[in-house]
Amino acid sequence: MPELRYRSRSYKRIFKKTPGGRTVTHYRRKKPSKHVCAGCGKPLHGVPRGRPYEIRKLSKSKKRPNRPYGGYYCSSCARKVFKKEARS
């Protein structure tokens, strides 16, 4: 029986074969879902997905695209926002 904390499905079960021939279960935290555009819901490019402790280690330029609304809107939706701002 696994430990109580590993019974939850927030852990991914990885089955590993040991050199002795036994199969053991390793528990690993699942990866977070991809970031999506606030406008259209498409997955964003250039935004890494990982647990907070992994993202913390990255430099600022690797965390999100370096442009206005980077990491929030996809390029096509950002273009629409720029046009709307310029016209108003």
UniProtKB/Swiss-Prot annotation:
Keywords, comma-separated and alphabetical: Ribonucleoprotein, Ribosomal protein
InterPro entries named among the record's database cross-references: Ribosomal_eL34, Ribosomal_eL34_C_sf, Ribosomal_eL34_CS, Ribosomal_L34e_arc-type
Keyword hit for Ligase: no
A single Gene Ontology CC term: ribosome
GO molecular function: structural constituent of ribosome
Domain of life: Archaea
GO biological process, one term: translation
Similarity comment: family membership: Belongs to the eukaryotic ribosomal protein eL34 family.
Protein name (Swiss-Prot/TrEMBL): Large ribosomal subunit protein eL34
Native source species: Methanothermobacter thermautotrophicus (strain ATCC 29096 / DSM 1053 / JCM 10044 / NBRC 100330 / Delta H)
